[in-house]
Every structure is written in C-alpha cells, then in structure tokens.
Amino acid sequence: MATYARTRQFDRDWRRLSATDRDRYRIAFRKFDGDLSAGRFRPGLRVKGVQGAPGVFEMTWAPDGRATFEYAEREGAGPHLIWRRIGTHAVLAAP
C-alpha cells in the first residue's frame, strides 16, 4: 500500500485552490492511488517526468491543473510519495 506526505509548499498551494479545484484533484487522486497500486497509470492522468527536474513527476488533474510529486525511500512494503506542488501549469516552473 502506498503512503504519502506533503511539502509545506503543497499545503500552501492547496489553500489557494478553489473548492471546485480541490474536488477535481480528489477525484484524480483516487484514480492515481488505484493506478499506483495496479502498477500502471491511466493515460488521462498524464503522469510523466517534469523536464529539467530529475526525479520529479507531474500528474494532470484538470485541463490546467497539475500536481508534482517525487518517490521517496521508506521502510516497509509499497511506494512512498511526497506531493510537492499543486496548482496551474505554472507550478512546473518551480516543481
């Protein structure tokens, strides 16, 4: 089972999102979490590496909604991810 953590920046970004955007992210996150467990991401989430940021990945949760994350080490079974940023496409400038 995957575990997750968030950066302070992610939490600050989260507070700036509208209620609608938060709901959109939650829907996408449920799909992401299931796909992570299955070992394959569906194309609609467009999970891919962020250019110029080795080890950082992005997930699309709305037409202009992005969330960035990285894989981290943990003891035990399953992956551990750290959510770094969330917001518009602009977050990719400082993922």
Where are these regions (language model features)?
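Enriched for short, Lys/Arg-rich terminal
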Residues: 1, 12-15, 57-95
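Arg/Lys-rich, positively charged N-terminal/basic patches that mediate binding to nucleic acids
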Residues: 1-30
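Residue-level signal for pocket-adjacent positions within structured domains
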Residues: 5, 12, 40-45, 87
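Residues that form or immediately flank small-molecule/cofactor binding pockets and catalytic motifs
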Residues: 9, 52, 88
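Secondary-structure boundary motif
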Residues: 16-19, 34, 38, 74
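Conserved short hydrophobic interaction patches
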Residues: 28-35, 89
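A short, surface-exposed loop/turn module that caps and links secondary-structure elements
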Residues: 33-60
